[in-house]
Design a protein with these regions (language model features):
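A short N-terminal helical cap/helix-turn-helix that marks the beginning
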Residues: 2-24, 43
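Conserved pre-ATP/AMP-binding loop-to-beta segment of ANL
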Residues: 18-21, 136, 152, 162-187, ...
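Conserved AMP-binding/adenylate-forming core of the ANL superfamily
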Residues: 23-78, 95-100, 153-158, 162, ...
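Conserved AMP-binding A3 loop
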Residues: 35-39, 175-176, 183-207
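Solvent-exposed alpha-helix faces
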Residues: 46-50, 107, 116, 193, ...
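Conserved S/T- and glycine-rich ATP-binding loop of Class I adenylate-forming
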Residues: 63, 80, 111, 182, ...
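Helix N-cap/beta->alpha junction signal
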Residues: 67-69, 115, 139, 181
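Structural core segment of the AMP-binding/adenylate-forming
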Residues: 82-160
Length: 211
């Protein structure tokens, strides 16, 4: 099957593989590997996509992800892609100054943060990022700063998409999606100067499957 955009990939795989395992993640509290099926993956991505619409995310908007590797990262990626959004990953060890530079350069409104370090770093520079409106926290164990009145947890974000209230908007955006849409901006480490944003389109990921 030929794909023109990453937004459709998870759902087509779910149609094909259903309840087969798509990925596993490690629960460090129980030391168990937790499976996620293709159907679960697809359903969660659809819910995340609807939550993005509820949040007010626009097509081609830049969404930041400042986190360790987590399954939530996939849901944000593919949920954003369904809205023709662009995701921008941060190094999990980025300093507050590095995060501030990327947020301001990419004009990020919504930043997903993983654990306590990422949250603390992002909150410390919130007031220096004119575009930044909200942090969305993956890990429920993260303790929010008492002064923080805008951040929400990931489960609260996902609740905004429960029941797929904006699915018609999502489907319209996905229908407009193009092979040449921007998928990610990857910032370099900045060891020889300010980080540079490398622009990767959906075609960069999909072309290897076509050859």
């Amino acid at each position: 099957m030929t794909y023109h955009h990453l937004s459709v990939l998870v759902h087509r795989q779910a149609e094909k593989y259903g309840d087969r395992v798509a990925l596993r993640y490690r629960d460090y509290e129980t030391a168990q590997w937790i499976p996620i099926t293709w159907n679960q993956f697809s359903g969660t991505v659809r819910q995340a996509a609807n939550a993005f619409v509820a949040l007010g995310v626009e097509e081609q908007e830049n969404i930041g992800i400042f986190s360790q590797n987590k399954p939530e990262w996939f849901y944000v990626d593919f949920g954003a892609f369904a809205n023709r959004g662009v995701t921008i990953p941060f190094y999990a060890t980025s300093s507050p100054a590095q995060a501030q530079y990327i947020i301001n350069d990419a004009q990020i409104r919504y930043l997903f943060v993983g654990e306590q370090y990422q949250y603390d770093s992002a909150f410390s520079i919130f007031g220096f990022c004119s575009s930044l409106q909200q942090l969305i926290i993956f890990d429920r164990s993260v303790v929010k700063d008492p002064r923080d009145v805008s951040s929400i947890y990931f489960d609260e974000f996902m609740a905004m998409g429960e029941g797929l209230p904006h699915n018609e908007v999502v489907e319209e955006r996905t229908a407009r999606a193009s092979y040449d849409d921007l998928a990610n901006i990857l910032y370099t480490s900045g060891t020889t100067g300010e980080p540079k944003g490398v622009m990767l389109h959906h075609s960069c990921y999909l072309e290897p499957f076509h050859t």
